[in-house]
Structures are given as C-alpha cells and as structure tokens.
Amino acid sequence: MSSLNIAVLSGGISHEREVSLRSGRRVADALTARGHNVTIIDPDAHLFVTLKNLNPDVVWPALHGSSGEDGAVLDLLHAAGYNYVGPSASAARLAWSKPEAKTLVSRAGVRTAPSITVAREAFRELGAGSVLELIASELGNHVVVKPASGGSAQGVSIVTKAEDLPRAMVDAFTYHDVALIEKFIPGTEVAVTVTDGASGATALPAVEIVPLDGVYSFEARYNAGETTFFVPARVSDEIAAKISAAAVTAHDTLGLSQLSRIDLIVDEAGEPWFLEANALPGLTETSSAPLAIEASGVDLGQLYEALARAAAN
C-alpha cells in the first residue's frame, strides 16, 4: 500500500498540553516507523493555513483537554473537509461532559455512582455551608470531587472527611465552572481501550491500575514508576466479560468511534461502575491504551496505521 501523508496535532493551549505533546510524538514515531510521512503540528492561529499547505490525507488529533477532547477542533476539521482519526465532534462533546455521559451510560444499563453537580455560582450564592450539608446528607462524607469536564485527574480529589470537602470544591472549580461530586465506590480501577473494526466495537484487555499512593493522580499517570499496571486485569473470566461489555456499551452509547478509553471501577462483588469516557485517549509511554493494544497481540504501529487508513477512506 502507498504511504499516507499524516498530520498529527499535539500540544495546544489546554492544561494537558505536555501530555498531548507526548502522545503526539509517540503516535508520530509509530506511524513513521510504518513508512508514512508524518508532520507534527502544534495548533495555533495558523493551523488551517498550515494544513492547507500540507494537504494531508488524514489528520490525527492527539489533543487532550479543552479545544481537543471537547470537540472544538474536530468540528473545525470536519467543516474544513479534513479526514481525521477520532469520533464526531458531537460524540466528543458528550464524553467530555462527565455528568451528561454518566446519565446516558446509566440509561444504557451500566452502573454509575450517585452524584450531584454544583455550579460555582450556586456554591457562592447559596452559601457553601448549605451546599456542603446537602452533599453530605445525600452522598455521605466519602466522595470524589471532580470538574464536570477535563482529563488527566486534574482538579480531582478523594474526600473522606467533611472538613476536606470545601478545599476539594475549590480545586474542582479551578478547572471548570461546575463540579461533579460522586459517592465513592470502593474497588479496583480499570481502564478499557475500545477499538472499532468491521464487526463493531471491541474491548481490548482491561488494564488494572494500582497507584503507589492509592490515588491515580496526574503525577501517578505520567511519571514512570508511580503506578503499577496489570494487563490483563487480575479478575476472573466472568468479571472480565462484564468489564468488556460495560466498556463497549459506554463506547457505543456515547457514539465514540475508532479508539476510546472507558474508565471503570470494579466493586467488591465484581460489578463494573462507569467513571468516565475518553474520546481521544492518552497515548504516552505511561498511558494505558498502548499497554492494552500490545497485550491484545496487535502491533502498536499496525493498529495506528489501520486507524489512519480507515479515516483517510
């Protein structure tokens, strides 16, 4: 087959810029090794002039955070007529909104933790005391607080004491105007990469995530040695099948395509609970998706090439 002219978008201006640069470099290296002509572009005000001059067969958006995973750049790529690897902009927006994604996936039959959303304005105008009291009465004191949108665990806190909740809310509001507060579900965290093929969506082996300090934070995600991964996850075949089914259901329900990552918690009874979906999953050297791809017996570059060719056609 002939080689492709591929533009990899990485970097950008979000809080996850450095992660995006690392993902983009790994994707570019894998595709270059397969014989393709790859250009890495750090999106700026001249992005579409650069793309017009390059005239790529396909664009690979290795973007994370706002303007990448929120569908904004995907919308513009589609409007400009470029083929790209990834979901539709509308699907990316659904996955980007954690509360909306939770609602849809729950309706599709996958467990989700009880939760409350709180806007920054409401937190200020109604008084922090009354809002915090409501959260405690509805969800208890052991909760997870996170921005309603965002990735890489930025602004995410696990709270076990009522006095720690105000600080966690402020941290979440640093990254978004709305905070999502969920009841803490004890269990094992797994990440499931889902790929699309001729026969539909397929879940790759689940990656079990065991951070050294017990919290899968930004540092634990991207600093080598901070987290131990088990691939496949250390669960029975029966539970593994449940995990795969939940991940595929979430992927399909949100309209994701080609490559996604679904994060789940497996409780003590072996039941998976949906945490969030990632429309443009991280592909760095410490990300779970490449681990899952390799564990499935597929060469990383071969899969990336297949995704690029499918998008180009």
Predicted features by range, described:
Residues 1-10, 94-187:
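Active-site nucleotide/adenylate-binding loops and adjacent lid/helix of ATP-dependent enzymes
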Residues 1-103, 107, 119-134, 306-313:
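ATP-binding N-terminal substructure of ATP-dependent carboxylate-amine bond-forming enzymes
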Residues 38, 83-84, 112, 143, ...:
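Hydrophobic beta-strand scaffold residues
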Residues 72-78, 216-223, 279:
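Short, flexible, mixed-charge acidic loops at enzyme active sites
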Residues 118, 156-161, 194-197, 266-267, ...:
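Short beta-strand-to-turn element immediately C-terminal to the catalytic PLP-Schiff-base lysine
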Residues 160-245, 271-273:
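Phosphate-binding site of ATP-dependent enzymes
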